[in-house]
C-alpha cells in the first residue's frame, strides 16, 4: 500500500482516542477508494492490560481544539465546578489534586489564551485565541509564561497561518449550530423559569403576587426592545440617587419656616453592626402627619452622648434643618442626656436666627415599660433571661420552689414552655391535643421584649385546657396548674393589661400623641399603685419641660382644653399656670402672623360670595383683612365647648378661625410622645439584615433603609404577607395574637379570656394582702419625691366581703410581700397635683 493510500485510510477513520468526531470526517474529501479490510485469518494473540474507565466530560463543557479537532475541554469561570469535578477524575488531575485553572494571572498574555485540558488524559494546556495553537500550561511543571509571550509576540505570522476553509456551507451550518438557541415561549417553559428563579434565589413563593414584581414585568412588556439588565454596581449607584431625590421631595412638604420634631434610637444588627436611626415628624400644609427617615447612620467606637450628638448634628446639617428642630424624643438611657446637652451647646454656638431651645421628650412607651418592670420586679416575677431558653433538664423540673405563691405559678408556665418547645416530638404531641385552628404552642417571656410576660400569660390562659390535658396525659403532674394558680394568672393579666394596651397603642399609632401624655399618666395611676413611684418620678419631670409643652399640647386637643385641669384632681393654680404658659408661648406666633398680614393679600382670596365689583372698588382692601389677636383666639377657643375629635383634624378645619393658635398647634402636635416609630423601623431593618445578606456593608444598609422609608416606615399589607414567608407559623401567629389581644382589650364590652380581679377578692384575707411593706423613711421619701403633681387623697375605706363572695379564690400568696406590719388599707393609686401647702405642718382631715 502506498503512502498516499495509508494517509487517506487514516483520514477516513476516526482517531483512536475513544471518541467520534463527525466534523473531521465530513470535511475530508472522498476519492472513491475501497475501505480497508483486515485479514481475519490472522490468529496471533496479544494480552493487553485493561485501562481504567475514563469519565467522559459533562455535556455542559465545551469541546475545542485546533483545525476543528475538538480533543480538548474549555475551562471558564461559569463552568468551573463541573470542569474541576471532571478534571480531578482524569489521570493528570488525580495526580495534581488541586485546581490550577482558577487563579490570579498577572501576566498580560493570559488575556489572549484559553485554558483547556485534553479529553484523553486531562493534561492541562493553553490555547491561543487567534489560531487555536496549543501550548503547555504554565502551571504544569512550573514552565512559566515565556512560551505564551513568544507565541503572542509573533501573532501576525500566526494569524496568516490559519487555513481558510473553502466549505462555506459547512461554516454556516457550524455557526448556526454553535449559536445560542432561544427557548420558544410556552406556558410550561414560563412556569419552569419562574419556579427555577424563585427556588434558586431562595425567595418566597408569594413573590409572584407582590404588586411591585407584577409592575416590573408589565414595564418590561411595554419596552420596544428587550430591556438590558444593569449590573449590581449600577443599581447600587442609582439607589443612592433615588434616596436623595425622595428625601428632598418629602422635606419640601415642610412649610417655609415651620418646625419639625425628631426621634432617635440606636440599634445593633444581627451582624453586630451599630446604627443610629433619626426620624422626623411634621405636619404639612394640608395637616397630614408626616414621618421621614432622616438618617440611618453607622456607628463606631463607644456610643457616648458627645459622639452621638456629633452624628445627629451631621444629619441635621446634611438636610439643612438645624434651626428647625422643636423637640427630640429619646429613651431614658443616660447618654441621651449628654447628647441633648451637647446638641444644645452646638446649636447655640452657631447663633442661628430666632433659635428656640430644643426640648428633650422622654419616650412614653419606655416609661410605661419601666414602671411595669418595677412592679414585676417588686413581685419578683420579672424574667431573668434575655432570650427564650431551648435547653431542658430534669434538674430544671426538680428546681421548683416549694411555696405555692405567684412566683411558682409563673415558673411553672415558663418551664412548661421550655419543656414543650425543646423537643419536636413534645411540640407535636401538644399540637395534636388541639382540635381547632390555629394550633399554638406555649411562649416564654424574655427580659428584653416589651409586654412579653403579658403575652406569655395570655397565650397560657388561651391554652388552659390543653395545658391541663397535656400534663395529665404525658406524665407531667408537677407542671400542671391548679385552679388557684390559674386564678393567679388572671390576677397578673389584670395588672399588666393597661400597660400592654397603652404600649401597643403608642407603638402602632401614626397620629399626633403629645396631647395624650397626661391622660395616660392619670389612667395608670388610677389603675395601679404598686408602680406609682416610678410613674411619679417621670410624671414630676413634665413640669421641667420647657414652656409646659405637655400642658399646651393637652389644651390644644379639642376634647381637653382647660376642662382637663378643672377636675377635683387638679389644684386651681395649675389651671391658671397652664393658661399663662399658653399665652406666653404663643407670642412669637402672633408676631409672625402679624408680619404676614402686612404683606399684600390678593383680594380675591378673601372675597365672600355675592360681593360685586363696584363694592370691591369702593371698599378698602385692608378693611377686608381678618383681624385677630392671640388673646382673643385663646378666649374664644377656651370659651367654646369641648369636642371629641382628632386634634389634627380639628385644627385643619379651624385654621382660619384661629390662625395664630393653629400655627402653634401645627408645631406642638408634631412632637411624638414615644419613639415607637423608630422601633417599627428596626423591625424592617431586621428583614434587610437577613442572614443570607451578611456581606452587606453598613453604608449599603443605610441606603436601603433610607430608600425603603423615604415615604413611610411600615410595609403595606401585601408586603407584610410577603414577609410572612420568611417567618415560621408560630411567629406569624404570635404577631396576629398580639394584634387580636389589643383589639379585644380595646373593645368596651368584650368578654376577656380571663376574669378580672374584683376589689372584694383583693381584700379577702389580711394574711394574703399584696400591699408592699413600707418603712416610715420610705414613705416620707416617696411623699417628697414621687407624690407627683396632684394632692394626695384620703385612703379609701376597706371593702368588706358580702355573703356571696365566700367562694371566691383568694389573692395569690407571695411570701416575699407579707410582713407583720401589712394591712389591708391601701392608698389611692392616683397622684394628683400637689397644692402649695407648707410641708412643715401636718394637716388633719376635718
Curated annotation (Swiss-Prot):
Bias (Acidic residues) ranges: 756-769, 797-809
GO cellular component: nucleus
InterPro entries named in the record: HATC_C_dom, RNaseH-like_sf, ZnF_BED_domain_contain
Chief location category: nucleus
Superkingdom, taxonomy of origin: Eukaryota
Zinc recorded as keyword: yes
Zinc-finger ranges (BED-type): 104-166
Cell location: Nucleus
Sorted UniProt keywords: Metal-binding, Nucleus, Zinc, Zinc-finger
GO molecular function: protein dimerization activity; zinc ion binding
Pfam family, one: Dimer_Tnp_hAT
Low complexity composition-biased segments: 773-786
Record flagged with keyword Zinc-finger: yes
Ranges for region Disordered: 734-846
Protein's job: Putative transcriptional regulator; part of the gene cluster that mediates the biosynthesis of polyesters containing 2,4-dihydroxy-6-(2-hydroxypropyl)benzoate and 3-hydroxybutyrate moieties, such as talapolyester G, 15G256beta and 15G256beta-2; as well as to oxidized derivatives such as 15G256alpha.
Protein name: Putative transcriptional regulator tpeD
Amino acid at each position: 500500500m502506498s503512502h498516499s493510500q495509508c494517509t487517506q485510510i487514516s483520514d477516513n477513520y476516526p482517531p483512536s482516542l475513544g471518541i467520534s468526531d463527525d466534523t473531521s470526517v465530513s470535511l475530508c474529501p472522498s476519492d472513491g477508494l475501497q475501505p480497508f479490510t483486515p485479514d481475519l485469518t490472522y490468529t496471533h494473540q496479544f494480552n493487553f492490560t485493561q485501562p481504567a474507565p475514563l469519565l467522559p466530560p459533562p455535556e455542559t463543557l465545551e469541546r475545542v481544539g485546533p483545525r476543528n479537532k475538538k480533543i480538548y475541554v474549555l475551562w471558564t469561570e461559569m463552568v468551573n465546578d463541573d470542569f474541576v469535578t471532571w478534571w480531578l477524575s482524569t489521570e493528570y488531575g488525580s495526580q495534581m489534586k488541586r485546581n490550577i485553572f482558577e487563579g490570579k494571572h498577572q501576566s498580560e498574555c493570559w488575556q489572549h489564551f484559553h485554558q483547556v485540558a485534553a479529553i484523553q488524559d486531562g493534561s492541562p494546556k493553553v490555547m491561543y485565541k487567534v489560531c487555536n495553537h496549543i501550548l503547555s500550561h504554565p502551571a504544569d511543571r512550573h514552565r512559566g509564561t515565556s512560551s505564551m509571550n513568544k507565541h503572542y509576540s509573533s501573532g501576525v505570522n500566526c494569524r496568516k497561518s490559519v487555513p481558510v476553509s473553502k466549505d462555506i456551507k459547512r461554516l454556516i451550518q457550524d455557526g448556526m449550530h454553535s449559536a445560542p438557541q432561544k427557548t420558544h415561549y410556552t406556558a410550561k417553559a414560563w412556569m419552569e423559569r419562574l419556579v427555577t428563579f424563585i427556588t434558586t434565589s431562595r425567595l418566597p413563593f408569594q413573590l409572584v403576587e407582590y404588586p411591585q414584581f407584577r409592575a416590573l414585568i408589565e414595564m418590561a412588556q411595554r419596552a420596544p426592545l428587550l430591556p438590558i439588565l444593569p449590573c449590581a454596581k449600577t443599581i447600587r449607584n442609582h439607589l443612592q440617587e433615588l434616596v436623595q431625590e425622595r428625601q428632598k421631595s418629602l422635606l419640601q412638604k415642610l412649610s417655609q419656616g415651620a418646625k419639625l420634631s425628631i426621634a432617635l434610637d440606636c440599634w445593633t444588627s444581627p451582624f453586630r453592626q451599630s446604627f443610629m436611626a433619626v426620624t422626623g415628624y411634621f405636619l404639612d400644609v394640608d395637616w397630614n402627619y408626616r414621618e421621614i427617615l432622616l438618617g440611618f447612620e453607622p456607628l463606631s467606637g463607644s456610643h457616648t452622648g458627645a459622639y452621638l450628638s456629633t452624628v445627629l448634628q451631621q444629619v441635621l446639617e446634611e438636610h439643612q434643618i438645624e434651626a428647625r428642630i422643636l423637640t427630640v424624643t429619646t429613651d431614658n438611657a443616660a447618654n441621651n442626656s449628654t447628647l441633648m446637652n451637647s446638641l444644645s451647646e452646638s446649636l447655640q454656638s452657631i447663633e442661628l436666627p430666632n433659635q428656640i431651645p430644643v426640648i428633650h421628650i422622654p419616650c412614653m412607651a419606655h416609661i410605661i415599660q419601666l414602671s411595669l418592670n418595677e412592679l414585676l420586679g417588686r413581685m419578683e416575677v420579672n424574667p431573668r433571661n434575655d432570650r427564650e431558653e431551648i435547653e431542658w433538664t430534669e434538674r430544671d423540673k426538680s428546681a421548683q420552689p416549694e411555696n405555692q405563691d405567684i412566683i411558682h405559678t409563673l415558673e411553672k408556665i415558663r418551664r412548661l414552655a421550655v419543656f414543650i418547645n425543646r423537643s419536636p416530638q413534645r411540640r407535636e404531641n401538644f399540637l395534636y391535643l388541639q382540635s381547632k385552628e390555629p394550633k399554638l404552642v406555649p411562649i416564654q417571656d424574655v427580659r428584653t421584649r416589651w409586654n412579653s410576660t403579658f403575652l406569655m400569660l395570655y397565650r397560657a390562659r388561651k391554652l388552659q385546657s390543653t395545658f391541663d390535658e397535656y400534663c395529665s396525659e404525658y406524665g407531667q403532674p408537677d407542671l400542671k396548674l391548679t385552679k388557684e394558680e390559674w386564678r393567679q394568672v388572671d390576677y397578673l393579666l389584670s395588672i399588666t393589661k393597661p400597660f400592654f394596651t397603652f404600649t401597643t397603642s403608642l407603638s402602632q399609632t401614626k397620629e399626633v400623641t403629645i396631647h395624650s401624655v397626661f391622660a395616660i399618666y392619670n389612667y395608670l395611676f388610677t389603675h395601679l399603685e404598686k408602680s406609682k413611684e416610678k410613674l411619679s418620678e417621670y410624671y414630676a419631670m413634665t413640669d421641667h419641660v420647657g414652656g409646659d409643652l405637655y400642658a399646651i399640647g393637652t389644651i390644644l386637643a379639642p376634647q381637653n382644653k382647660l376642662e382637663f385641669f378643672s377636675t377635683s384632681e387638679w389644684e386651681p393654680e395649675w389651671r391658671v399656670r397652664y393658661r399663662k404658659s399658653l399665652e406666653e408661648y404663643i407670642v412669637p406666633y402672633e408676631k409672625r402672623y402679624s408680619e404676614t398680614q402686612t404683606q399684600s393679600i390678593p383680594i380675591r382670596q378673601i372675597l365672600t360670595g355675592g360681593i360685586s365689583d363696584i363694592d370691591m372698588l369702593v371698599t378698602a382692601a385692608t378693611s377686608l383683612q381678618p383681624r385677630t389677636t392671640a388673646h382673643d383666639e385663646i378666649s374664644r377657643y377656651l370659651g367654646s365647648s369641648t369636642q371629641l375629635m382628632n386634634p389634627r383634624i380639628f385644627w385643619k378645619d379651624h385654621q382660619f378661625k384661629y390662625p395664630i393658635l393653629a400655627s402653634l398647634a401645627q408645631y406642638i402636635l408634631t412632637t411624638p410622645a414615644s419613639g415607637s416609630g423608630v422601633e417599627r423601623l428596626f423591625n424592617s431593618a431586621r428583614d434587610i439584615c437577613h442572614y443570607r445578606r451578611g456581606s452587606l456593608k453598613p453604608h449599603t444598609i443605610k441606603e436601603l433603609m433610607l430608600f425603603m422609608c423615604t415615604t413611610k416606615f411600615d410595609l403595606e399589607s401585601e408586603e407584610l404577607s410577603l414577609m410572612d414567608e420568611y417567618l415560621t407559623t408560630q411567629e406569624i401567629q404570635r404577631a396576629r395574637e398580639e394584634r387580636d389581644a389589643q383589639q379585644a382589650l380595646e373593645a368596651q364590652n368584650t368578654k376577656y379570656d380571663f376574669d378580672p380581679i374584683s376589689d372584694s377578692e383583693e381584700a379577702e384575707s389580711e394574711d394574703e394582702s399584696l400591699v408592699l411593706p413600707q418603712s416610715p423613711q420610705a414613705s416620707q421619701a416617696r411623699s417628697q419625691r414621687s407624690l407627683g403633681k396632684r394632692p394626695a387623697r384620703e385612703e379609701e375605706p376597706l371593702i368588706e366581703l358580702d355573703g356571696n363572695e365566700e367562694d371566691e379564690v383568694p389573692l395569690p400568696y407571695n411570701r416575699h410581700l407579707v410582713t407583720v406590719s401589712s394591712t389591708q388599707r391601701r392608698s389611692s393609686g392616683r397622684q394628683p397635683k400637689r397644692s402649695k401647702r407648707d410641708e412643715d405642718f401636718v394637716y388633719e382631715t376635718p
